[in-house]
């Protein structure tokens, strides 16, 4: 890991560049028996530049690049990649009104490669966005703070590009590798929110967001009957808008200050999600596909309620909180049993929609300063859904149902220049559907599923990170450095 920060241009500009890279196969895979024959690799790079034109105008430019790769020798490789480029202009109109104009580009890519005789293929999917947003903050007085703004985004969805080097998987599944499903959409929003203090003990925050989502061509839209069989198709020209969704998203939060160190908060908000992910929940190829809203797939709508109690101790040195939440979700999607999505132009017909719910409690204790600082958090949460034609129509746990989540972060300052830290995280294993049997025909093995969804789980996940940091002596005016040793 290397990070470099420095001012320049007589202090009117500043820059920061950092990067990390690791190859876990060199050390971890040789030390840990269960990881032998596997490779672990990741890197990330980030850079940020800030320039001050004058006291009312500043410009920020930042970028992030990263990849995570997990490989199983002579079998499978999974790659996640992210790219982000952002430019933000901050302008101060006066002592009450400020604005931020942002333009950014993001790209998420997910690729899985399989190399197992006679198969040698890869599937790539992802999302690419180009966005702009303009946000304003208006401080009317000491009691009223108003925020408002607008945004526009151009989405591109890649839903599974098949690269078949031997042709074996295409022949086995009877698909054409050129059948790549690409979709485009436009999304706009207008929003307004107000943080309003009603006296010294009570405050409310309310707002409203208008969101609009439009599908645009070039695209071939396939139409399905009640049995999810394709009965017709419509071809749309490049740039042609063929579907529009518009929704209002209200939100309301209230806080009551019981005394100097404790408070109660309650909130409600509605969110509309125009892009949903469907997960292949079987124990075979782990693959996720993003589906934009369309005439075939409605946007997901979620109503969330939350209630929390917050208490500080020892003059705010220690913060504690307990929060309860409940979510009611409409139009949640999942893949049907035996879904066929590789090179499938009719992939919308493999998706089923239903309703979901999530609930839980979050507990947090944080120590903010002193030689020993850090936090301990625990979250208990459940996520369940009911979807037609899945799990015999009965409720089942979603792929995101991981009931127990523990996080412990501790930092200890041994001297002014030397400190150590430890981080431990634990999560319940992700739900998965394993086959209960198999059979072989003409040398090809097929899995058998009994229709029950997500009855099993992957092993629980836990990780311990240890680090020690030694700050260099301040011998130079223009730069500061530190040495860091981390063990994951």
Label for each model-derived stretch:
Residues 1-52, 60-64, 322:
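Predominantly transmembrane beta-strands of Gram-negative outer membrane beta-barrel pores used
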Residues 5, 50, 303, 397-488:
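Conserved C-terminal beta-signal and adjacent last beta-strands/turns
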Residues 8-14, 55-56, 95-98, 141-145, ...:
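Short loop/turn motifs that connect adjacent beta-strands in outer-membrane beta-barrel proteins
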Residues 40-161, 319-321:
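Outer-membrane beta-barrel domain signature, strongest for Gram-negative TonB-dependent receptors
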Residues 109-110, 156-171, 214-230, 256, ...:
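Surface-exposed extracellular loop regions of Gram-negative outer-membrane beta-barrel proteins
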Residues 129-133, 179, 187, 292-298, ...:
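Outer membrane beta-barrel strand-and-loop segments of large Gram-negative receptors
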Residues 147-263, 274, 390:
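Signature of Gram-negative outer-membrane beta-barrel scaffolds
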Residues 325-328, 346-436:
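Gram-negative outer-membrane beta-barrel transporters
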């Amino acid at each position: 890991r290397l990070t470099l920060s420095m001012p320049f241009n007589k202090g009117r500009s500043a820059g920061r560049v950092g990067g990390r890279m690791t190859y876990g196969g060199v050390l971890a895979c040789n030390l840990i028996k269960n990881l032998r024959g596997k490779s672990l690799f990741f890197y990330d790079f980030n850079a940020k530049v800030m320039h001050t034109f004058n006291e009312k105008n500043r410009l920020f430019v930042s970028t992030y690049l990263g990849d995570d790769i997990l490989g199983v020798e002579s079998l499978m490789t999974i790659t996640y990649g992210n790219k982000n480029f952002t430019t933000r202009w901050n302008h101060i109109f006066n002592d009450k009104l400020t604005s931020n104009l942002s333009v950014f580009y993001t790209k998420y890519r997910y690729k899985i490669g399989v190399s197992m005789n006679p198969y040698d293929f890869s599937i790539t999917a992802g999302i690419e966005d180009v966005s702009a947003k303009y946000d304003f903050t208006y401080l009317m007085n000491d009691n009223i703070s108003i925020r408002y703004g607008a945004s526009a985004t151009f989405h591109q969805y890649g839903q599974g590009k098949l690269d078949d080097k031997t042709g074996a998987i295409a022949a086995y599944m009877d698909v054409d590798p050129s059948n790549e499903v690409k979709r485009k959409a436009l999304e706009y929003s207008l929003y307004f929110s107000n943080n309003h203090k009603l006296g010294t003990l009570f405050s409310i925050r309310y707002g409203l967001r208008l969101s609009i989502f439009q599908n645009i061509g070039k695209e071939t839209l396939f139409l399905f009957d009640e049995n999810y069989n394709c009965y017709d198709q419509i071809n749309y020209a490049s740039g042609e808008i063929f579907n529009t969704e518009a929704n209002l998203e209200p939100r309301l939060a209230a806080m009551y200050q019981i005394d100097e160190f404790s408070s109660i908060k309650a909130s409600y908000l509605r969110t509309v999600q125009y892009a949903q992910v469907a997960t292949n929940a079987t124990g075979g190829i782990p693959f996720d596909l993003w589906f934009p809203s369309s005439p075939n797939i409605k946007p997901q709508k979620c109503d969330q309620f939350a209630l929390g109690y917050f208490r500080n101790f020892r003059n705010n040195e220690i913060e504690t909180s307990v929060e309860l939440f409940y979510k009611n979700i409409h139009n949640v999607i999942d893949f049907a049993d035996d879904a066929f999505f590789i090179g499938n132009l009719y992939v919308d017909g493999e998706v089923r929609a239903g309703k979901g719910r999530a609930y839980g409690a979050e507990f947090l204790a944080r120590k903010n300063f002193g030689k020993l600082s850090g936090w301990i958090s625990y979250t208990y949460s459940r996520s369940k859904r009911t979807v037609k034609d899945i799990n015999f129509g009965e409720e089942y746990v979603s792929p995101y149902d991981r009931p127990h989540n523990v996080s412990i972060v501790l930092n200890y300052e041994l001297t002014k220049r030397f400190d150590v830290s430890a981080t431990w995280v634990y999560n319940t294993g992700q739900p998965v559907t394993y086959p209960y049997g198999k059979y072989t025909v003409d040398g090809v093995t097929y899995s058998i599923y009994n229709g029950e969804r997500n009855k099993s789980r992957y092993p629980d996940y836990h990780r311990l990170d240890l680090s020690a940091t030694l700050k260099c002596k301040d011998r130079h005016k223009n730069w500061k450095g530190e040495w860091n040793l981390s063990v994951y």
